[in-house]
């Protein structure tokens, strides 16, 4: 696990002079967030338009992607205005952007956990599924998710006076140097991501193995199309959970793997760059694993025929 010397980084920031490297780092993250913005919006619209996703799983997907869209806009706004354009008033309130991202982190992860739990229950408790994921229960799950994250974030920011601030050295957000907060903020973000990611992947693996091993019993009364869709949904959430788990490991240990001696860029690629790349990767996984999304995308956005053939061939190969 890499130890980032926040005190030294704060001292460096006191003599900070804007350079082309700052503009480059800001532009890279801005482009990531802009790409993620369009993809996440497409997923959200698709969830409302596609008949197969007008379901409990689709509602949970909308909740997760809305939370991730908010994180994407938050990060993209700061990177464009503060890092790329070096607007001082924006930089001076970096803690507002950072604290908001800390609040959204558990919302996004718990949303993924709810999606995994949904697939788990659909597989192992089909007779109770409608009760477990009725409209009222889904609303309860979602409200509880946001309230729990709000309470945890409020405790960190208000009670323990923790702030997630921007450092020019490495172009990253990290906890501010505070006696009352200490390392609590770092431990919170790392532990919640690790615990929830492992739980998500564990649920997904159990569900996917059960679907593959007992598909004839689980879906004996369902059509081939329904079986394929359920496997696709399960594959989607297991990949997304695994990516979050790998990202947590990369965040902590990627610094030792990267070549070169410039710690600024090593910090950048293991934190800000990789974190915001998730805004792009997650919706791409959705499109890759869901035939309904691809059909809807091709039909509504006039994707060239050549690209259709390529995706069809890849999809057939994966099948």
Swiss-Prot record:
Q: What's one GO-annotated cellular component? A: perikaryon
Q: What happens when the gene is disrupted?
A: Insensitivity to ascaroside pheromones.
- Record keyword Cell membrane present: yes
Membrane topology of this protein:
Multi-pass membrane protein
State if Transcription is listed as a keyword.
no
Provide the alphabetized UniProt keywords. Answer: Cell membrane, Cell projection, G-protein coupled receptor, Membrane, Receptor, Transducer, Transmembrane, Transmembrane helix
Q: Which GO terms describe its biological process?
A: calcium-mediated signaling; cellular response to pheromone; locomotory exploration behavior
Q: Which InterPro entries match?
A: 7TM_GPCR_serpentine_rcpt_Srx, GPCR_Rhodpsn_7TM
Write down the PROSITE patterns for this protein, in alphabetical order. Answer: G_PROTEIN_RECEP_F1_2
Locations listed in the record: Cell membrane; Perikaryon; Cell projection, Cilium
| Tissue spec. comment | Expressed in ASI sensory neurons.
Which parts pass through the membrane? Answer: 28-48, 67-87, 95-115, 138-158, 164-184, 194-214, 267-287
Molecular-function annotations in GO: pheromone receptor activity
Q: What does this protein do?
A: Receptor for the ascaroside pheromone icas#9 which suppresses exploratory forgaging behavior. In response to ascaroside icas#9, may furthermore play a role in the expression of genes in the TGF-beta signaling pathway, such as daf-7, and in insulin signaling pathway, such as daf-28, which may in turn contribute to exploratory behavior.
Instruction: Report the sequence similarity comment from the record.
Output: Belongs to the G-protein coupled receptor 1 family.
* Protein name from the UniProt record: Serpentine receptor class X-43
